[in-house]
A protein has these predicted regions:
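N-terminal signal-anchor/first transmembrane alpha helix
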Residues: 1-41, 117, 195-196
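Hydrophobic alpha-helical transmembrane segments of membrane transport/permease proteins
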Residues: 19, 23, 27-63, 220-229
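Generic hydrophobic transmembrane alpha-helix motif, especially the helices
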Residues: 60-64, 95, 104-110, 114-166, ...
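Transmembrane alpha-helix signature in integral membrane proteins
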Residues: 70-105, 250
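Transmembrane alpha-helices
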Residues: 79-95, 184-215
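Non-cytoplasmic
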Residues: 131-132, 140-145, 149, 199-234
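Conserved small/polar residues in nucleotide/adenosyl-binding loops
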Residues: 244-251
């Protein structure tokens, strides 16, 4: 197999990944549009639907013990996951990027203090730290995003700081300093464009990990309110059925859809 064949395989893999991500984003956008028009208002009623109903044309994956449509609730949970993850990554980037730039450029005591704080936060396991922060802040979409923000901010800080330390020693930066350019110009014109290139990779990794952490918080009852469709809380509800009743096909069906998502 020659180099061109490898390139074609790599291109096909990238296209497949792009199509998968595009499909999920399309589903999320459709669900948000339908939610905005109150299309799913009926799915939350415990009186209109039978509990533990089997799959049918009306309920593709059946209903749970509260009479809610499992399939629709899982799809609605996808829009919530994207919303919380987007806010968390945005907050983390907004905090870690400027602090990393300033710390890496100025150095000294300021750099040591920030690095110590961020390294301390980074040393704590992600799940443990997110659980503690979510417990302190309480339930809510914004609080869940803030909990994830505190968890992931040190990663952006460390990445940008290390890149800034490398870039500020380059010849063009030193030339700008000698020519009398102010700090703002040096940071935003010469350093920032050259330190953000690794960010898309970290953003992708954190987004995937944040979905798992959000599900863990919901499973422990520390994420969003119980009435909001969320994968972790739905799995917790399904687990209660499996533990306290005989695991019948209807109980397995209730947990299969959120776990596969």
């Amino acid at each position: 197999m020659d180099i061109n064949s490898f390139n074609r395989v790599g291109a096909n893999i990238r296209k497949a990944g792009f199509l998968i991500v595009l499909f999920y984003l399309l589903v999320v956008l459709i669900m948000k549009f339908l939610e905005a028009n109150n299309f799913f208002g009926y799915s939350f009623s415990m009186l209109s639907n039978d509990i533990f109903a089997p799959p049918s044309l009306n309920h593709f994956c059946g209903t749970d013990r509260l009479g809610r449509d499992v399939c629709l609730r899982t799809l609605q949970g996808s829009s919530l996951a994207i919303e919380v993850v987007f806010l968390a990554i945005l907050f983390s980037l907004s905090l870690g990027l400027p602090l990393g730039l300033l710390s890496g450029y100025f150095g000294g005591f300021f750099d040591k203090c920030l690095s110590l704080i961020m390294d301390t936060i980074f040393s704590i396991p992600v799940i443990l730290l997110s659980v503690v922060v979510a417990f302190v802040l309480g339930k809510g979409i914004l609080n869940a995003a803030l909990a994830l923000c505190i968890v992931y901010s040190p990663q952006y800080f460390r990445l940008i700081r290390n890149q800034t330390i490398l870039v500020k020693s380059e010849t063009y930066v030193e030339a700008a300093q000698v020519s009398g350019a102010d700090v703002k110009t040096i940071i935003f014109k010469y350093i920032l464009p050259n330190v953000i290139t690794p960010l898309p990779i970290l953003l992708t990794l954190n987004a995937a990990d944040a979905v798992l952490v959000l599900g863990s918080l919901g499973f422990l009852g520390l994420g969003v309110p119980a009435d909001v469709p969320e994968w972790g809380s739905d799995l917790n509800l399904a687990l209660a059925c499996l533990l306290y009743t005989s695991p019948s096909p209807r109980d397995k069906r209730q947990s299969r859809m959120p776990s596969s998502a």
